[in-house]
Amino acid sequence: FLLRVRKKLTGEESNSAKEADASTGENDMEVEKSASAVEKPSGEGGKGPEYEERLAKLKDILSGKTPTDLYLHFLYIHSKTDLLILKSIKDKLKPRNTVTHIATIMSHAIMNSGTTIDTFLRDNLQWLAKATNWSKFTATASIGVIHRGHYKESLKLLQPYLPSGNSNSNSPYQEGGALYALGLIHACDGGEQASFLQESIKSKNEIIQHGASLGLGLTAMATGDTAIFEELYEIIVSDNAVSGEAASIAAGLVMLGTGYEEGIENLIGYAHDTKHEKIIRGIAMAVGLIEYGREEA
């Protein structure tokens, strides 16, 4: 609802929004009335600097940017994380135990979720580099948990890890994790980084596709964007277990709570055709996400 109001305020109306408008009569009439009431305030036309300033603030509130900034500031100044506990855990771990290594990284991410405080990681880069393969993917993605909502600095923070045209680029696990982290930072922001992630899912590497798909699903969550859904569906039907599972979950996130019947039919139809259990599991989750909150429908 808030996303539709925001689009009305900014004058943007995508094809997917038009399709959604056609199928939701009464709700859209209410949205249009609400938007019209904001666009046409009483007084002298309502187009002065004060009006524009208020409209900009309203857009930020509806988009979630203002609440996110407030949460970010609050969590930063009220963080009570005890780094000595993490240091003690790290020092007592066996050097080659990958399970406890990644568990420590994840516990740090949870302890500092949304605070933007990543001092422990910066002070222990050599120890952090011991992560390999999917552990490296998870370790890089944990940056997104710590910096959740840090929109302005997201690309700058992740630049060293994101895919680039350089032949001596990072590990695909690190790049995939960085794309997932980007999605975690921009989760539910209406698709602000969608175009960047849409380019990334075109990669031929399944690990990068995995991370980019999850990131795209998070940043475009509940937008109901059929174009993004179709791009993700193309990855699903490519029948790669690693990228297909992530794309399935991402497709469900994009259509969260929309009850998109055509998408559900296509997903279930493909679930009967594929032999990959990961894709079947991902599709099952996607169907649940698409029908989220629609038990009465």
Predicted ranges, named:
Residues 3-13, 17-19, 23-297:
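Alpha-solenoid helical-repeat scaffolds
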